[in-house]
Amino acid sequence: MGKSFLDCESLIALQEIATNPVDLTLPGTLSQDRIQQYALSAEGFTYSYATERVDDRSLNALRMLAEERELIKQMESMQQGAVMNYIEGFQSESRSVLHTATRAWVRDHDLKDEAASIANHSEREAHRLAEFLYAARSKFSTLVQIGIGGSELGPKAMYFAMQGICPSDKRIFFVSNIDPDNAAEVLKEVDLKQTLIVVVSKSGTTLEPSVNEELFKRAYQDKGLSVADHFVAVTAEGSPMDDKTHYLEVFHLWDSVGGRFSATSMVGGVVLGFAFGYEVFFEFLQGAASMDAHALTPIMEKNLPLLSAMLGIWNRNVLKYPTTAVIPYATGLKYFTAHLQQCGMESNGKSISRQGKEVHFATSPIIWGDVGTNCQHSFFQSLHQGTDIVPVEFIGFLQNQRGIDCVLSGSSSSQKLFANLVAQSLALAQGRDNDNPNKRFKGNRPSSILVAQQLSPRIAGGLLAFYEHKFAFQGFCWGINSFDQEGVSLGKELATQIIGLMSGAAPIEFPEARELLRLFNVLQ
């Protein structure tokens, strides 16, 4: 794979095809044959892409591009523990990427070396978790997870994804922001004596969880309660938090498991296991592990995350659409798009190739969205008639989670919900002509639909892994490092200096910050 992304023959072919892409507004385009042909069912999901602006020509070229970029080979290498987090010739993390190993132990696998070690350690941690939960779930009624980024977004998204279907008498809260109001609003809701605090930080020194942990510790001390009897740490071995004298229990994660990919490690395991029971967490892992195996399917049209990734490449790099909206028609996925923003944009929001050279093509689109049907009444006007075309990824389910529904005018609420999903996809694709220009819909606005029977723990795990692999495949295709996040560091470094200015502990050689602080009356 010596050539760059822009030099791929198949990409050049795709650019030629894009001068005259399929017209979804023409009568008969969305035929029964097309809808049946442009669909894939696997792992409990059915994926429809008939409303994408692709045809056999573009799909063939996308398949060739995936083969040129050796995407399946790279996915195999990643899952087997090859060093994938690197920049050639420059200082970088130079690590394996082994979030898949945190759930590989729930199925048969042929992992070796570091990957096998992580899988074995993950199994041992899971068994320790099961023992811990047996006592903790009988003693505590509430859990507060303190973390930031992947220590909050993924676990929070998955907790709410399963909350509607898994019976639980537990109360769960998440504290992430360094804004003290975030912690204060949780503190007023909980009985500290009945509350387990889970602090998640791989390094053990991350600013936000460190500050919030201290805030909660003081609240416990003010009540005369033992911190060590209520606090649990999830951290790397050897970190400052890896000390059982200060915690009720310590669970471990590894450098090769990035934060945004860590929901299937103990980062998600403690909170999900506490909320719903260990068996539910195990089922969740099974769904993710099954999607990991499926992601190695060598044929693009039979590989869910690879197919979605390549359609995303088509929309981003060939049709030149700058954003992607993810719209789940499920209340349980109300925090899922926020997780995808981190998973996609922190992974692929890069402008440097693995060779350390600036790239001259678009990488990650802006990812955004909200839950349907709510967002039909907010930003869908722009999706249908705005000046920017936004590809939409719809997610839907045939059955609701809670089993409460009513039939009105001949259809249930669940049927009405799903009808709206399908209607939006067709309306975006086909549009509608009208003599009144204000009522005209141009159409040719692409979308895909991913559907499962019900949002169960297994499907939640599969959905999580589907997007993890989609973003990884896209990063492999672009030739960038999807597994570091250098863009997070500069602002953090400057914030540390500014905190020093505000506390009087830093020298004055930061005039720009000093003047801004004076402007806002922070400094006199």
Swiss-Prot record:
InterPro entries to which the protein is assigned, alphabetical: G6P_Isomerase, G6P_Isomerase_C, Phosphoglucose_isomerase_CS, SIS_dom_sf, SIS_PGI_1, SIS_PGI_2
CDD domains with a match to the protein in the record: SIS_PGI_1, SIS_PGI_2
Molecular-function GO terms, alphabetical: carbohydrate derivative binding; glucose-6-phosphate isomerase activity; monosaccharide binding
SUPFAM superfamilies registered for this protein in UniProt: SIS domain
Keywords: Cytoplasm, Gluconeogenesis, Glycolysis, Isomerase
Active site (UniProt): 346, 377, 492
EC code: 5.3.1.9
Cellular component GO terms held in the UniProt record: cytosol
Pfam families: PGI (PF00342)
Gene3D superfamilies found in the cross-reference section: 1.10.1390.10, Glucose-6-phosphate isomerase like protein, domain 1
Metabolic or biological pathway, per its Swiss-Prot or TrEMBL entry: Carbohydrate biosynthesis; gluconeogenesis; Carbohydrate degradation; glycolysis; D-glyceraldehyde 3-phosphate and glycerone phosphate from D-glucose: step 2/4
Any one biological process term the GO annotation gives: gluconeogenesis
Localisation: Cytoplasm
Reactions catalysed, as given in the entry: alpha-D-glucose 6-phosphate = beta-D-fructose 6-phosphate
Enzyme class of the recorded protein, top EC level: isomerase
Family designation: Belongs to the GPI family.
Job description of the protein: Catalyzes the reversible isomerization of glucose-6-phosphate to fructose-6-phosphate.
NCBIfam families named in the record: PRK14095.1
UniProt-recorded name of the protein: Glucose-6-phosphate isomerase
Organism: Chlamydia muridarum (strain MoPn / Nigg)
Upper lineage: Bacteria, Pseudomonadati, Chlamydiota, Chlamydiia, Chlamydiales
